[in-house]
Amino acid sequence: GGFGGLKLANKLKKSGFQVVLVDKNNYHQFPPLIYQVASAGLEPSSISFPFRKIFQKRKDFYFRMAEVRAIFPEKNMIQTSIGKAEYDYLVLAAGTTSNFFGNEHIEEEAMPMKTVSEAMGLRNALLANFERSITCSTERERQELLNVVVVGGGATGVEIAGVLSEMKKFVLPNDYPDMPSSLMHIYLIEAGDRLLAGMSEDSSRHAEQFLREMGVNILLNKRVTDYKD
């Protein structure tokens, strides 16, 4: 139900095929704007689009909310959480998940940013920490709640670091006037030698300059090997 699945389903319109889309959610998520949900800039409904509404005029389209548990290619069959289904052609467009590079500890403790629910988890954690920090008795306790580390200098990492810096600069002074925004520190850690490695060097340079001007602490050529609370 991601970009690949939707594009194929649309391309098969009037092809004579019966198209069955299987997804664990009954809506499509728009990944490029998930970071806006995490920062409370957008509500989840703004980037979530129900499959049935998208394809409601298609008589050749069927949707089933389920998870695929097993594939039996010799039988042209899949086993899902709601039962079995036969197919003539099977297309796997499951999307991606966060890569923790085998570090189970970080996987357990970190907050990934691939889905709307994960973005909401980050949003709720941030807002809860803001509220808790107001009642802390010492500056050190406040800082422990307000330090945010973003690992990965790709598009998502740069975007979330950017909106967090905007929250620090514009939201905190207005919504939390009794808490100095200077206590919030944002770190962006990238294992490579530049941000946005998949884009042009000019884009990387502008992104780094903007984030530094916004107060983000950028650490390049640094790998995160573990996490300790």
Label every model-predicted segment.
Residues K57-F72, R212-Y227:
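A conserved beta-strand/loop element that lines the FAD pocket in flavoprotein oxidoreductases
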